[in-house]
């Protein structure tokens, strides 16, 4: 609060000066009006910069709004009067607005503190709290959004085979740092990605470009050999395009940024179990990750992760499923290159027999692989020491370490995981971990494996820095990795005590209830979407066919169709013949219009109902024709019996009358 003495001093000391200023301004305005009448065209005098700044500040703080428009107009040509407004008047106007509650903080003025002028402290605490909370929210949103592209995308979603002749200190400390291009020997990917150029289900000698898409080596060389030109619309000049774009995503790619690919099946990766699904049985393994290590291993292996290192050798079959980066020797890399050459030659024989392929890009592919082999051999002076080092390293691994006696909760992280070879990592939900911790009291006392039923799976979770700070056992995963949380059905777990289940029964029921409500909501939204899509298609077909049926009628037809589908009456398949009424002993027979199936221009079959009046006329016309034909036949028989015989002993036969049919509902006889 401002002291009363200061308020009196401020009001008493500045009252006279303010009145003098107003009088001087009014007199100057009158004089300015009279001078403007005498001299309508007059030159403006150069204004003072200091007075201009004070005048703008005076108008900003509200003093100028209390004056008339006439005074404001007169102040512009004569700025000498503004020099009488001193700093004391500006401070007084600010003080009055603050006391009246009309002062608003706007623009850069908010960064200037005026507390020393008023001798009291403004309440800045609430504003700082709101500012800090908003900044935390913005930072949280920024952390949750992870953009992956290029090497970061490859580092997150795929495993790598790297050259064992190099050390990787940056990757040892931070899993988010991508490995250099020249140190990557193979990128291990799961099967299922087709080559978008030749559309083969399994690319031959697969290669990965910068964006992460996979192509055949020969297809990729053919793509890079095509020269594209760009034409300038203004000048009409065409020039060669300097770069290539990915056929799938449009990212800039080049022949020097291509990585060899190795499929998991070729790498003898066996799936421990299938992808988890709600209601299915899942096998969970207890993983152990010591502090400072980036390699979690199952406790059942009895292998110390610190002895294996963060990047174990690739030919160690028992742990190659769990390592994100593995070291590979030159001999194994040469073996993989030889497999690529054999695959290219086999595919060429097939293409030559079927398509009469010239083999131009096949030769270029083999030459490209030979160049890579030469580069690899040139960098290696002697291959035997490398293989000996790998074999000696394998002898150091012992599968008799008891991890539970060596590590506990204070020295390692213990957690459950399944399907470790997948790009999406599956872990237990926090509530399930809490229940297990209540049962066994320590993470290291958890069972080595659990086989139970999955109740629900939560997807759409991405590893961020905030998530790693919350769950430290996922610190070995790169930022951007997709994870899924599994909810277990604790009603089917035998080792759960009854009292502990009752302790968490409310939370489990609430979680199950939320899952049921979410599923019902999704099913409802799906039905609404399908109904809306069906209505849009029906509206489109009606517009194309020129039918003037209203949208409300289409909704009624759709409702009627749904009622027919949901009824208990068995619906037989529609044939080309007319459909009769449904046979049902419980229901009364109803008269229905006959229907036919008609094939539309889109290749679909639809039921077509004929007009009853037209059908009745057609039926009468057909009956009349049959009756007329019978009469003609009977008349022929009587004529043949009554006619006299001819000279050669045969009776004469009368010629039949003709019946002419026209394409109308009316009969015409001739």
Curated annotation (Swiss-Prot):
Zinc finger (RING-type) in chain: 195-250
Top EC class of this enzyme: transferase
PROSITE patterns assigned: ZF_RING_1, ZF_RING_2
Major subcellular location class: cytoplasm
Family: Belongs to the RNF10 family.
Catalytic activity reported: S-ubiquitinyl-[E2 ubiquitin-conjugating enzyme]-L-cysteine + [acceptor protein]-L-lysine = [E2 ubiquitin-conjugating enzyme]-L-cysteine + N(6)-ubiquitinyl-[acceptor protein]-L-lysine
Organism field: Saccharomyces cerevisiae (strain ATCC 204508 / S288c)
This protein's name: E3 ubiquitin-protein ligase MAG2
SMART domains: RING
